[in-house]
UniProtKB/Swiss-Prot annotation:
Chain residues that bind UDP-N-acetyl-alpha-D-glucosamine: 8-11, 22, 73, 78-79, 100-102, 137, 152, 167, 225, 332, 350, 365, 376
NCBIfam families, A to Z: glmU (TIGR01173)
Entry function: Catalyzes the last two sequential reactions in the de novo biosynthetic pathway for UDP-N-acetylglucosamine (UDP-GlcNAc). The C-terminal domain catalyzes the transfer of acetyl group from acetyl coenzyme A to glucosamine-1-phosphate (GlcN-1-P) to produce N-acetylglucosamine-1-phosphate (GlcNAc-1-P), which is converted into UDP-GlcNAc by the transfer of uridine 5-monophosphate (from uridine 5-triphosphate), a reaction catalyzed by the N-terminal domain.
Oligomer and partners: Homotrimer.
Stated name of the protein: Bifunctional protein GlmU
UniProt-annotated location(s): Cytoplasm
Pathway annotation: Nucleotide-sugar biosynthesis; UDP-N-acetyl-alpha-D-glucosamine biosynthesis; N-acetyl-alpha-D-glucosamine 1-phosphate from alpha-D-glucosamine 6-phosphate (route II): step 2/2; Nucleotide-sugar biosynthesis; UDP-N-acetyl-alpha-D-glucosamine biosynthesis; UDP-N-acetyl-alpha-D-glucosamine from N-acetyl-alpha-D-glucosamine 1-phosphate: step 1/1; Bacterial outer membrane biogenesis; LPS lipid A biosynthesis
Region ranges (N-acetyltransferase): 249-455
Length: 455
């Protein structure tokens, strides 16, 4: 028996008050639907079917990299109708698991428990007990605790509304069962929809075993209906990430002011992360790294014993061991800092390698530049890499000393151990071991007086 997963993602999401389809809104930097797909893949299904509707072409365009089978539900007539669109693509002997594109934190542990504890010919649902179950379907049991049916909130009687055990919507049974039950559904209810939950009563009526598996926590089965629910779930997720990292030996100064936006974040023990830090995409931090407040790291690797000072923004960079960056530094894609390099305040780099032990301490732009070892780049230095049409490369060889307020008009090479005088504008190569100065000689004009204002 193989496993087919059906993810229902066709809801309109009106309460999000957004032109973006609900399932494309991110949680922890990843779209809601993608999170559910990633979890489903951990179960090793042979196929993942996604039933989409609202904003369909936009959803497929944005998430076309996902390994799923897309099925359009042109009319949103309820969850039962949505599953009916996908079930013809499932083999009769398949075990079918039904998930929801707006329930992003469901855990593989709970899903495995559901699959393992549901008889091969039975039906299983994930249930949860909530302090306030308003708006959610209730689990109806007999005196022996057996599940009899699920009643939606709008269709529930007064005594049923007092029940706190709710249906999460997550369900598993065989494809053969669904092919038998789904055509029997009707829309004789308050919402005039075909409810998937009505299959529970059909299963009970024919003696099919029905069981429930409890969710580990309320948050893992929390659906996202509006921005506020998404915000609360985001904070819960970030606290989970902070706790996971802390238990692995990372110091998170304030878990309430920490954001991890991506699933490929690897942080070694003894790293210290200050407040308002955002880690996005693929981020790797080695031992003893210190990240100051208000730092953004995206798709970046940082070597051991390196310190990133406050308010630095770093994207797609490689920073090796024992480096110092910032405060207020910006490293753009393609930046590489070799071991012991230093980038100070208000320095911007792009497609530039700063060699071992080299430093650019202040107020500098380095673009399309290869810098060797033990180079000093003075304050106010600019590599002029763009001529209005093309980018050109600058090379600064080992041991060079670049004075303050120097403009290097690429393409050019500054030779090994060369010294460039402050205020120079170079448009030709500077030879090694020599002082090169490219500026007008200072002169004083005798007898000159400042102009005076006319009366």
């Amino acid at each position: 028996m193989g496993l087919s997963v059906i993810i229902l993602a066709a809801g309109q999401g009106k309460r999000m008050a957004s032109s973006t389809p609900k399932i494309l809104h991110p949680l922890g930097g990843i779209p809601l639907l993608e999170r559910v797909v990633n979890t489903a893949r951990l179960l090793n299904p042979h196929t993942i079917h996604v039933v989409y509707g609202n904003g369909g072409s936009h959803v497929r365009e944005k998430l076309n990299y996902l390994p799923v089978h897309w099925i359009e539900q042109s009319q949103q007539l309820g969850t039962g109708h949505a599953v009916l669109q996908a079930i013809p693509f499932c083999q009769n002997e398949d075990r079918v698991l039904i998930l929801y594109g707006d329930v992003p934190l469901i855990s593989p542990k709970t899903l495995n428990s559901l699959l393992e504890n549901t008889p091969s010919n039975g039906l299983g649902v994930v249930v949860a007990e909530l302090p306030d179950p308003t708006g959610l379907g209730r689990i109806i049991r007999d005196d022996f605790g057996n599940i009899l049916s699920i009643v939606e909130h709008k269709d529930a009687a007064e005594h049923q509304l007092k029940i706190r055990e709710i249906n999460t919507g997550i369900m598993t049974t065989t494809a053969m069962n669904l092919k038998k039950w789904l055509p029997q559904l009707n829309n004789n209810n308050c919402q005039k929809e075909y409810y998937l939950t009505d299959t529970v009563a059909l299963a009970v009526a024919e003696g099919c075993p029905v069981g429930g598996v409890a969710a580990q926590c309320c948050e893992e089965v929390q659906g996202v209906n509006d921005r506020w629910e998404l915000t609360k779930l985001e904070r819960y997720y970030q606290r989970l990430m902070a706790k996971k990292l802390s238990l692995a030996g990372v110091t998170i100064i304030d878990p309430e002011r920490f954001d991890a936006r991506g699933e490929n974040i690897e942080i070694a023990p003894d790293v210290v992360i200050d407040v308002n830090v955002i880690l996005e995409g693929n981020v790797q931090l080695d031992r003893n790294v210190r990240i100051g407040p208000n730092v953004i790291l995206k798709n970046t690797t940082v070597g051991e014993n390196t310190e990133i000072h406050a308010n630095s923004v770093i994207e797609a960079a490689v920073i090796k061991a024992n480096c110092s960056v910032g405060p207020f530094a910006r490293l753009r894609p393609g930046s590489v800092l070799e071991e012991g390099a230093k980038v100070g305040n208000f320095v911007e780099m792009k497609k530039t390698t700063l060699g071992r032990g080299s430093k650019a301490n202040h107020l500098t732009y380095l673009g399309d530049t290869i810098i060797g070892k033990n180079v000093n780049v003075g304050a106010g230095t600019i590599t002029c890499n763009y001529d209005g049409a093309n980018k050109w490369q600058t090379k600064i060889e080992d041991g060079a000393f670049i004075g303050s307020n120097v403009a290097l008009v690429a393409p050019l090479t500054v030779g090994k151990n060369a010294t460039i005088g402050a205020g120079s504008t170079l448009s030709q190569d500077a030879p090694p071991d020599q002082l090169t100065v490219a500026r007008e000689r200072q002169r004083t004009i005798k007898g000159w007086h400042r102009p005076t204002k006319k009366e």
